């Protein structure tokens, strides 16, 4: 096999970053991204894009930390380059606050973000309902800019994009030698995975340019994330809810909660509502599967199920997925020894 033909199904931040990593790590390959939705219509486009890790209960902490560190380092390099504006990546400082002292005062990712420290009593006076807080600088990755930036890199290295809805991964055989499944919630159908389910997230995007620091309730439910063109206010966490239409009551609750943390938001204007469905499962699925029909085989690398933590770990998990693809390519290129029987 000369050129390995690789299809990546899914064009959110997970699919595109995986395609970039494959093109870097796997020699002599062609990469095609196939999806029925590309930016600006993906779930990733709704995400606020703050690098504050979600914890996966079924994944060892050292693995999660490695994923986060690799992602942080990748985006930090972009933030410190001339590409930062085009890629939508920048540093942002702020506070994560708690109404009771958390059991883990120093989270596993504290030495990856910049300047992590306990908030002072003077800082906590801004939040009278809160008793404990963490101050740090992290990165914000804005997908409406970052996804086109990734696409540009994929096409620049000879990759392709194809707008098409896939009903069955086997459709891609024999046109492709290897398939990488980054379809998120689509994996309920494409991989028969009943463990994955939607968690609906609604956010507001508002104009409030005076808000320069992020504020996040330790529960992760209420947050204020300033960006380059707007401030994102959140949020909701509705398990099993497939509704993509904005809910007016949700919007009122979000605005009320965020104004309680930052009263100046009463003056915010140009409020836009956005909804996305996070692909939740107990842990990210990073696994190779060999599909077989009628004596034919199709290696599939599954890479999905990041929930609300996708942007925080996307590059780390994409590197791992690319390594699995590299193993598949090596296996396909290794001749099967002839039997002496």
Swiss-Prot record:
Expressed in epithelial cells of the proximal nephron tubules in the renal cortex (at protein level). In the brain, expressed in the frontal, temporal, and occipital lobes of the cortex, hippocampus, striatum, diencephalon, brainstem, cerebellum, spinal cord, plexus choroiderus and ependyma (at protein level). Expression is increased in the prefrontal cortex of schizophrenic patients. Levels are normal in the superior frontal gyrus of patients with Alzheimer's disease. The keyword Ligase does not apply. Its EC number is 1.4.3.1. Optimum pH is 8.3-12.5. GO terms for biological process: aspartate catabolic process; aspartate metabolic process; D-amino acid catabolic process; grooming behavior; hormone metabolic process; insemination; nervous system process; regulation of cell communication. InterPro entries: D-amino_acid_oxidase_CS, DAO, FAD-dep_OxRdtase. May be S-nitrosylated. Optimum temperature is 45 degrees Celsius. One of its GO terms (molecular function) is FAD binding. The keyword Oxidoreductase applies. It is found in: Peroxisome matrix; Cytoplasm, Cytosol. Its cofactor is FAD. FAD binds at residues 36-37, 43-44, 50, 307, 311-312. One of its GO terms (cellular component) is peroxisomal matrix. Changing residue 136 to L: In a breast cancer sample; somatic mutation. Keywords: Cytoplasm, FAD, Flavoprotein, Oxidoreductase, Peroxisome. Inhibited by the benzodiazepine olanzapine. Inhibited by aminooxyacetic acid, thiolactomycin, malonate and meso-tartrate. Clozapine, haloperidol and chlorpromazine have no effect on activity. Not inhibited by sodium, potassium, magnesium, iron, calcium, cobalt, copper, nickel, manganese or zinc ions. Not inhibited by AMP, ADP, ATP, or cAMP. Not inhibited by pyridoxal 5'-phosphate. A motif (Microbody targeting signal) lies at residues 339-341. Belongs to the DAMOX/DASOX family. Monomer. Interacts with PEX5; the interaction is direct and required for localization of DDO to the peroxisome. Interacts with DAOA; the interaction is direct and increases the degradation rate of DDO. PANTHER family: D-AMINO ACID OXIDASE, D-ASPARTATE OXIDASE. This is D-aspartate oxidase. It comes from Homo sapiens (Human).
